[in-house]
Amino acid sequence: MKSSVCVLLKVLACILLPGGLNAQKESNDDIQHYTADDCQVTPVIHVLQYPGCVPKPIPSFACIGRCASYIQVSGSKIWQMERSCMCCQESGEREASVSLFCPKAKNGEKKFKKVSTKAPLECMCRPCTGIEDANVIPQELAAFADDGSLAGYFQKSQFKAAE
C-alpha cells in the first residue's frame, strides 16, 4: 500500500512516499521531509539467452529498493518548483563470462558460445534522469486559480492512494 505523507513547509506541498509508516522524519529550519532510502544489492536469478543456445539460469545481482524524492515550491522563486528525483542505481559493476550450450550450431561453429554479462557491484540512491522543462505544465494551464491569496494557488490532490 502506498501512502501520501503531507508536510507543511513555509507553503503547502505533498510528497508521495512509498515507504509509508517506515519513513524516517528529518528536518532543518526551512523544511520537513521524509526519507525512505532502501537501495540494496539483491541476489537474483538471471536467465542468459542467445539465439540457437539453451537458456541458462545463473545467480546474479540487481539493485532493488526505493529512494526519497520530492517536489516543492522554490524558496527564492515561488513561481518555480524544485525537484529532487533519486533512483536506486548501480555504483560499479562486475563482469562475468558464461558458456552457453548451443546444440543447433551449424557445421564449423562451436557448440559452446561464450557470453559476457554484468551485474552491479554496489547500489546507491543517485539522481534519476532530469525532467525536461518542456514536459512541465505551467500552473496557469494546470487550472490553479489565482484569487490573490496563497491558499488559492493550491488544490486538493486528484490522486488516490493505491490499496
Swiss-Prot record:
Keywords: Disulfide bond, Hormone, Secreted, Signal. Its main location: secreted. One of its GO terms (biological process) is animal organ morphogenesis. PROSITE patterns: CTCK_2 (PS01225). GO terms for cellular component: extracellular region; extracellular space. One of its GO terms (molecular function) is BMP binding. Residues 39-129 form the CTCK domain. Pfam families: DAN. It is found in: Secreted. Residues 1-23 form the signal peptide. Final heterodimeric neurohormone released at the end of the molting cycle, involved in the sclerotization (tanning) of the insect cuticle, melanization and wing spreading. Heterodimer of burs and pburs. The bursicon gene is encoded by two loci: burs124 contains exons 1, 2 and 4, and burs3 contains exon 3. Exon 3 is trans-spliced into position in the mature transcript. This unusual gene arrangement has existed for at least the 150 million years (MY) of mosquito evolution since the split of the culicid and anophelid family lineages, but is younger than the 250 MY split of the dipteran suborders Nematocera and Brachycera (containing the Culicidea and Drosophilidae, respectively). This is Bursicon. It comes from Aedes aegypti (Yellowfever mosquito).
